[in-house]
């Protein structure tokens, strides 16, 4: 489900930005942010997951449910996950002003699409996260030390039952 979130967000943001900017290559890409971006990653908006945490404000339900036979069956309780996504303008220093403009348009996209429908997964919410300069410095240090203009977004995902791997 997380890969569907990041891929859908990248595709929709790329469609939005492509209507404003005529470029042969894609503008938005999901991937890790490298300290020294390679040619494929340079001059793009990069979406990168920087943290995943369990949201407990929704409550943690009991792992049992009532069945049709009035018996109880053990289940996996649903999880709510906070996915932190860094939206960074990874451009060469010569294209700094262009990177700021494209990042600004990316923020407009996020504002206009704060609720995003995922294919066969339901909807997710997107909201900007305010972090201190110290926290921002820590994040960029972990990502390799080179700062790029960026915004941090939070997405809430609901995972109702384990799907792919099943239970042991």
Protein language model features and the residues they cover:
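Acidic, glycine-rich loop-and-strand cores that form catalytic or ligand-binding grooves
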Residues: 99-124
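Short, conserved charged micro-motifs
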Residues: 94-97
């Amino acid at each position: 489900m997380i890969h569907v979130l990041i891929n859908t967000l990248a595709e929709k943001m790329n469609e939005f930005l492509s209507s404003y900017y005529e470029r042969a290559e894609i503008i938005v890409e999901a991937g890790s942010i490298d300290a020294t971006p390679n040619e494929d990653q340079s001059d793009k908006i990069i979406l990168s997951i920087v943290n995943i945490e369990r949201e407990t404000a929704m409550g943690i339900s009991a792992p049992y449910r009532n069945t049709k036979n009035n018996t109880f069956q053990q289940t996996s309780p649903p999880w709510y996950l906070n996915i932190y996504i860094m939206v960074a303008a990874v451009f060469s220093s010569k294209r700094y002003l262009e990177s700021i403009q494209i990042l600004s348009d990316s923020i407009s996209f996020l504002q206009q699409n704060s609720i995003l429908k995922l294919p066969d997964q339901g909807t997710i919410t997107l909201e900007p996260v305010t972090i201190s300069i110290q926290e921002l410095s820590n994040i960029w240090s972990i990502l390799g030390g080179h700062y790029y203009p960026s915004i941090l977004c939070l997405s809430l995902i609901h995972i109702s039952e384990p799907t792919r791997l099943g239970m042991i």
